[in-house]
Curated annotation (Swiss-Prot):
PANTHER family: NUCLEAR PORE COMPLEX INTERACTING PROTEIN, NUCLEAR PORE COMPLEX-INTERACTING PROTEIN FAMILY MEMBER A2-RELATED. This is Nuclear pore complex-interacting protein family member A7. Residues 151-171 are annotated as: Disordered. Belongs to the NPIP family. Signal peptide: none annotated.
């Protein structure tokens, strides 16, 4: 071929019948049968094409099988794959299941959000309608104000419930405390009653006689009329010791003349002076306990007492609240004979010399001890 080209170049590019003959003869001599190069080349090309088709078919079938395996995974664990591949498949399957669960959760949340948004849109539409209606009537409110009012009402209701519950708890605690104090007071009252009963049983029978009360009434009347303090030793026990020796009764009679009352005390009913005892703190001469006192201060405007200087024991003038109906001739009258004395009563008091005073609810203190 190159020879032909060189021959053409050497010949100056002119083609003649001679040159064509030379080429044809060379071709016939070198390549018998065809111009392509002969049968060996055809055989090689044919074999190569057949092998290429086979390789292409093998590759295509392998790819198809791989694709089918990917689409339809085998349920059999012993499919000839290695452990690494099986673990990878399992992890992929779990991952796919996890992705599916996550997608379901996402869709659920999306539905919830969509529901809330739709409800809010519906509320906004209703609020818009209400606002349009109220705008005509001169009113206007928004969804925020409505929600704020609802929240305030809920808070107020919750606060009221809390206050009621707290008040109930405080009331229960107060009632419990009151019940405790009542129990303590009742126990103290019971102890006081027991103590009173115990000491009342220890009092001597002579102190429980009516004479003791009469003597105490006389002492109270003496204290009220004279202004001296009341001495608790004027009891039956002290009077018993003092009544043993008495001076003779005085002959002088004291007559008290007042604008509204005139008293004439008989000689047998005069209160005799008592001798001093061991527990007497008064420094009184034994000849007479009823002695005139020094002149006192000027009486006030509301003082109706007219106290003579010669004697302190005298009846008071009747007051506005005095309901006693006492005969004016004598307030100190002898008492009727008392009960016979008991075995432990050593008082020897004649019945005509016991001081009897009129009963007055504001001037008499009866001791029950």
């Amino acid at each position: 071929m190159f020879c032909c080209l060189g021959y053409e170049w050497l010949s100056g590019g002119c083609t003649t019948w001679h040159s064509a003959w030379v080429i044809n003869t060379l071709a016939d001599h070198r390549h018998r049968g065809t111009d392509f190069g002969g049968s060996p080349w055809l055989l090689i090309i044919t074999v190569f094409l057949r092998s290429y088709k086979f390789a292409i078919s093998l590759c295509t079938s392998y790819l198809c099988v791989s694709f089918l395996k990917t689409i339809f995974p085998s349920q059999n664990g012993h499919d000839g794959s290695t452990d690494v591949q099986q673990r990878a498949r399992r992890s992929n399957r779990r991952r796919q299941e996890g992705i599916k669960i996550v997608l379901e959760d996402i869709f659920t949340l999306w539905r919830q959000v969509e529901t809330k948004v739709r409800a809010k849109i519906r509320k906004m539409k209703v609020t818009t309608k209400v606002n349009r209606h109220d705008k005509i009537n001169g009113k206007r409110k928004t969804a925020k104000e409505h929600l704020r009012k609802l929240s305030m009402k809920e808070r107020e209701h919750r606060e009221e419930e809390r206050q009621v519950s707290e008040a109930e708890e405080n009331g229960k605690l107060d009632m419990k405390e009151i019940h405790t104090y009542m129990e303590m007071f009742q126990r103290a009252q019971a102890l006081r009653r027991r103590a009173e009963d115990y000491y009342r049983c220890k009092i001597t029978p002579s102190a429980r006689k009516p004479l003791c009360n009469r003597v105490r009434m006389a002492a109270v009347e003496h204290r009220h009329s004279s202004g001296l303090p009341y001495w608790p030793y004027l009891t039956a026990e002290t009077l018993k010791n003092r009544m043993g020796h008495q001076p003779p009764p005085p002959t002088q009679q004291h007559s008290i003349i007042d604008n509204s009352l005139s008293l004439k005390t008989p000689s047998e009913c005069v209160l005799y002076p008592l001798p001093p005892s061991a527990d007497d703190n008064l420094k009184t001469p034994p000849e007479c306990l009823l002695t005139p006192l020094p002149p006192s201060a000027l009486p006030s405007a509301d003082d109706n007492l007219k106290t003579p200087a010669e004697c302190l024991l005298y009846p008071l003038p009747p007051s506005a609240d005095d309901n006693l109906k006492t005969p004016p001739e004598c307030l100190l009258t002898p008492l009727p004979p008392s009960a016979p004395p008991s075995a432990d009563d050593n008082l020897k008091t004649p019945p005509e010399c016991v001081c009897s005073l009129p009963f007055h609810p504001q001037r008499m203190i009866i001791s029950r001890n």
